[in-house]
C-alpha cells in the first residue's frame, strides 16, 4: 500500500521535473527522451495439490481444469520503455512487454495459462502527459498503482489500464487524484479462463477487468465486463509522521448483475514513531464495498474489512510486524480492480483475495533483515507466517469468495533478494511458500519463484 502511494507522488515529481528542463522543439523532445528497459529470466514451480488433468478444459468447477496441477515453467521476458522530454508541458511515453516460454509442456500450459503462459509482445503503455503548475494529466494506456486500482506486476506481464488520471498537489502536504478507466489488460489472454491452456497468448485491452475479491465467480475467474470506472483519492501528510489516505472507486454496469454498479471504499492511516534506535510503525485500514441493485446485492459483496498492524523497522537491520484483519459476516469485500490491491494479512505468494471473503479472520507475522548492516550490501531476507480462518456462510444463496465448510489455512513464506552491487541493475530473488488448507479434507500446496532481472 505504501508503494501505491509513493507511485502516485512519483508521477507528480516526474511531471514537475520534466517541465523544469523542457525541450525547445519537438525534435529536441524526442532526441532528449529517455529509454529504459529490463531483461528477465523467471522460473516458477507450482503444486496446487491437484493432479495434472489429461485435458485442459476452460471454465470453473467442476469441469474446468485451468490453473490446476503440478508443473514448472521457465519464461524469458523483456520490458522496453521510452518517454520524450517535455515540450510546453507535454510528453509522450510508451512501454512494450514481451514474454516467451520455450519449454512449456501441456501440464505447464494448463496450469499457468491464466497468469504466466503466453508468448509474444503487447504495447501496455502508450500515453500523453501534460503538466501545468502543480497539476499533471496522464491519458492513455498506463500502469496504475493505487489501493483500489492497481496493476499487479508479480507475473511476467504486468497488468495495465486504458485510463485518464489527473493529479494535483496545490494544497499543502496533500495529493489529490481523479481517474477514469474503460479498458483493462490482464496477464495473459486467458486471464478469464475462457480457452484451453495451450491456446493462451499475449493479453489485449478489453472492456472487462479483474475484480479482486470475487473469487472464481464468473466461469472460474474473477473477471467481469464493465462500462467505465471512476476513482478519486487523497493523500495528506499535514501531521508530522502521519500519512492519511482515502480512495473511492465506482464501477458502472458490472457484468452478470443486471446493470448493477459497484462502490468500493478505502481509508488508511500510517503513523511512524521515531525512537532512538528504531522506528515504531502503527497502521490501520478500512476496506468496504456496496452494490446498487437486487441482482448485485444477491452476490453478497457488501462487506467491511478492518485491518491493524504494528511493527518496527531499522532496528540494527531488522524489521518485524504483526497484522490482523477481519471481514463482516456473510458479506465479502471487493478489494478493487486489477490483481494489485493488497491487505496487511495477504500471504506473500497466494495474495490478498484469500483474506477478503465473508466470515474471515486472518493473522500474519513478518520478520525481515537487511544484511547491509553486516557488510553485505543489497542482500535482504524476509519470513512470514499467515493463518486464515474462514467460516461458511450462515445464509442461503450466493456469497462470492466464500467457502462451503469452515476452513483453516496456514502459509509459511520466505524471500531472499539480492541487488548485486558489482553488476548494477541486476537483481536476483527467490520466493517460496508452503500452504495447508483444511476443511472437510486437507490440501497441501506450494510454490517456488526465482527471478533474475536486469534493468538498464
Predicted feature locations:
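Short, surface-exposed connector motifs at secondary-structure boundaries
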Residues: 240-244
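Aromatic-residue hotspot detector
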Residues: 30, 85-88, 161, 294, ...
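Short, solvent-exposed beta-strand-terminating loops
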Residues: 89, 94-105, 184-188, 324-335
Amino acid at each position: 500500500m505504501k508503494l501505491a502511494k509513493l507511485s502516485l507522488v512519483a508521477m507528480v515529481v516526474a511531471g514537475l521535473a520534466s517541465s523544469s528542463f523542457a525541450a525547445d522543439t519537438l525534435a529536441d523532445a524526442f532526441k532528449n527522451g529517455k529509454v529504459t528497459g529490463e531483461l528477465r529470466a523467471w522460473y516458477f514451480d507450482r503444486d496446487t495439490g491437484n493432479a495434472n488433468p489429461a485435458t485442459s478444459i476452460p471454465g470453473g468447477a467442476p469441469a474446468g481444469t485451468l490453473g490446476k496441477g503440478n508443473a514448472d515453467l521457465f519464461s524469458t521476458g523483456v520490458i522496453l520503455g521510452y518517454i520524450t522530454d517535455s515540450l510546453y508541458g507535454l510528453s509522450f511515453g510508451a512501454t512494450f512487454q514481451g514474454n516467451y516460454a520455450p519449454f512449456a509442456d501441456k501440464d505447464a500450459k494448463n496450469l499457468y495459462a491464466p497468469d504466466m503462459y503466453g508468448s509474444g509482445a503487447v504495447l501496455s503503455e502508450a500515453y500523453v502527459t501534460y503538466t501545468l503548475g502543480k497539476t499533471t494529466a496522464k491519458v492513455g494506456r498506463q500502469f496504475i498503482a493505487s489501493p483500489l486500482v492497481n496493476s499487479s506486476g508479480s507475473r511476467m506481464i504486468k497488468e495495465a489500464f486504458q485510463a485518464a488520471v489527473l493529479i494535483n498537489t496545490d494544497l499543502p502536504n496533500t495529493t489529490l487524484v481523479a481517474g477514469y478507466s474503460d479498458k483493462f489488460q490482464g496477464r495473459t489472454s486467458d486471464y478469464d479462463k475462457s480457452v484451453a491452456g495451450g491456446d493462451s497468448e499475449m493479453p489485449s485491452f478489453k472492456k472487462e477487468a479483474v475484480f479482486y475479491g470475487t473469487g472464481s465467480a464468473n466461469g472460474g475467474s474473477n473477471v467481469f465486463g464493465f462500462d467505465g470506472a471512476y476513482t478519486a483519492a487523497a493523500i495528506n501528510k499535514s501531521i508530522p509522521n502521519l500519512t492519511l489516505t482515502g480512495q473511492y472507486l465506482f464501477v458502472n454496469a458490472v457484468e452478470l448483475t443486471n446493470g448493477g454498479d459497484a462502490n468500493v471504499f478505502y481509508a488508511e492511516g500510517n503513523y511512524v514513531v521515531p525512537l532512538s534506535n528504531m522506528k515504531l510503525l502503527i497502521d490501520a485500514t478500512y476496506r468496504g464495498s456496496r452494490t446498487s441493485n437486487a441482482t448485485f446485492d444477491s452476490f453478497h459483496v457488501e462487506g467491511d474489512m478492518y485491518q491493524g498492524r504494528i511493527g518496527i523497522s531499522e532496528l540494527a537491520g531488522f524489521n518485524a510486524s504483526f497484522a490482523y484483519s477481519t471481514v463482516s459476516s456473510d458479506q465479502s469485500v471487493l478489494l478493487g480492480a486489477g490483481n494489485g490491491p493488497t491487505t496487511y494479512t495477504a500471504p506473500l505468494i497466494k495474495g490478498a483475495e484469500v483474506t477478503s471473503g465473508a466470515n474471515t479472520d486472518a493473522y500474519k507475522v513478518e520478520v525481515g533483515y537487511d544484511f547491509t548492516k553486516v557488510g553485505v550490501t543489497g542482500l535482504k531476507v524476509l519470513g512470514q507466517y499467515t493463518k486464515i480462518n474462514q467460516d461458511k456462510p450462515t445464509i442461503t444463496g450466493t456469497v462470492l469468495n466464500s467457502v462451503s465448510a469452515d476452513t483453516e489455512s496456514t502459509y509459511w513464506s520466505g524471500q531472499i533478494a539480492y541487488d548485486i552491487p558489482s553488476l548494477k541493475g541486476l537483481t536476483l530473488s527467490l520466493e517460496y511458500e508452503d500452504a495447508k488448507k483444511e476443511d472437510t479434507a486437507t490440501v497441501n500446496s506450494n510454490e517456488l519463484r526465482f527471478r533474475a532481472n536486469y534493468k538498464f
